[in-house]
Amino acid sequence: APLWDIVPLLAALYRDRTISTELREDHELISGLATENYRLAVLTEPVRGHGLVSRKYGEEHLMFSLPAGHPLAGRKSLRFSDLNGAAIPLRPGIGFWEEIPRKKMPDSHFFVQERSSSFEELVHAYAMPCFSSDLARRGRELEPDRVTIPIDDPEASVEYFLAWRRQDEDFLRPFLDAVLREAPRGK
């Protein structure tokens, strides 16, 4: 979700550069920064040392999106265990958010829908529960036939940190000035 804001800003500020993204584990991104494969990374933990700098960028909170008629739809909050055993479609390219429910809901059946349109059709046609987040919902109208309910488990919340090599700070200054004056995002 942080890339939804970051990539367009980078593209606008660095028009003469190619902007590319990869979804990787934090340790792989840190290694890529250290070996100069990356100039900027979004991590879920702050990093210090090895010539790297990080600053909090924002946070994200996972939620269940349920059909309005679902037995749990009236609850103020839920835990992963409340829907353990359910069949739940997942959007593609959600990175670590795919692994957390798999670990916390071992009896559930998860299946990734490769196209967003297929995901939406499936969720609505079969009135299935799915995941959303405060960042995914930002700027979007709530669907009248669904409710979103926060997940209380600590694993359902994450902080994001921008990380970069200190030697790239001058190059990244326009981006850092623009994005960090507005941070943190989420909640």
Language-model segments: residues:
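Short beta-strand->loop
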Residues: 53-63, 68, 130-138, 142-158, ...
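Central regulatory/effector-binding core of bacterial HTH transcription factors
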Residues: 1-49
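A late-sequence structural motif
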Residues: 147-187
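Flexible hinge/capping segments at coil-to-helix
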Residues: 50-62, 66-88, 173
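Hydrophobic hinge/microswitch elements
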Residues: 25-30, 34-37, 43-44, 89-149
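Short beta->alpha connector loops
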Residues: 24-27, 46-48, 69-71, 94, ...
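Secondary-structure junction motif
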Residues: 2-6, 80, 84-108, 172-176
